[in-house]
């Protein structure tokens, strides 16, 4: 809801509510797929979502929008940029890893590790950036971020990856450190992408639901690229 209000405040309620329902359903079915025990092919649970996609195209024929192409773009960007990454968090909890891991159908440790890497990356980047940051990372998008802060956050994440490797053996040390690097780098890109979105729309915060901290997008921006990147890493490079 926050995203769609941000990108298009004047959109039709028919579109706004259908986009929210579509995104919510996409997150739900992505969480359901790893637990699908019945013989029902997975494609059947996507049918309502396919109906939403068809509706999104057809409804524009009957609404007098000034720029329906932009409206379509906003609708589908919300699905890909917000709903899909959130739904993919379930695939982090159910990755096809080593035999020891497969004995446990669900294990929250990778999800906890995922968020711990994001947190330590932000913390490390802030500490190092405030202390010695001089060279701007992306001045035209986010002037406060520095290369020193970026590498500081990455170093903190790699160190935490090593700590995780000493406690959890279902990934070896190299895999843990690789995972920490992936989350660190892509969470930084996620932060930059959300800042580019706000700069393009000429807004400071994505919302005001969290006083003093902006909106939910401002708090979750690191997830939106780190989640898909983590799934790719786990499924293609480790499994």
State where each predicted segment sits:
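C-terminal transmembrane helix pair
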Residues: 198, 223-225, 229
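Active-site alpha-helix of zinc metalloproteases
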Residues: 117-118, 183-187, 214
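Hydrophobic transmembrane alpha-helices of multi-pass small-molecule transporters
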Residues: 157-158, 219, 226, 235
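Juxtamembrane boundary at the C-terminal end of a transmembrane helix
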Residues: 232-239
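Juxtamembrane interface at the ends
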Residues: 125-126, 130-131, 195-203
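Interfacial loop-to-transmembrane junctions
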Residues: 200-222
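Membrane-embedded alpha-helical bundles of polytopic integral membrane proteins
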Residues: 1-181
């Amino acid at each position: 809801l926050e995203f769609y209000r941000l990108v298009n405040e004047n959109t039709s309620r028919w579109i706004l509510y259908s986009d929210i329902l579509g995104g919510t359903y996409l997150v739900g079915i992505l969480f359901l797929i790893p637990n699908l025990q019945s013989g029902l092919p997975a494609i059947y649970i996507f049918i309502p979502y396919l109906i939403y996609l068809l509706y999104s195209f057809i409804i524009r024929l009957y609404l007098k929008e000034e720029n329906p192409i932009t409206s379509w773009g906003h609708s589908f960007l919300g699905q890909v940029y917000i709903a899909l990454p959130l739904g993919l968090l379930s695939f982090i909890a159910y990755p096809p890893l080593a035999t020891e891991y497969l004995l446990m159908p669900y294990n929250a440790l990778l999800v906890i590790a995922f968020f711990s890497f994001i947190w330590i990356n932000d913390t490390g980047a802030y500490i190092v950036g405030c202390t010695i940051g001089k060279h701007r990372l992306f001045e035209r998008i986010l002037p406060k971020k520095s290369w020193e802060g970026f590498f500081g956050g990455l170093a903190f994440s790699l160190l935490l990856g090593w700590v995780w490797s000493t406690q959890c053996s279902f990934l070896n040390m190299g895999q843990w450190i690789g995972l920490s690097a992936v989350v660190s780098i892509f969470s930084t890109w996620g932060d930059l992408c959300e800042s580019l979105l706000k700069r393009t729309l000429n807004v400071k915060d994505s919302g005001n639901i969290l006083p003093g901290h902006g909106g939910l997008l401002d708090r979750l921006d690191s997830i939106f690229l780190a989640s898909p990147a983590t799934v790719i890493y786990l499924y293609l490079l480790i499994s």
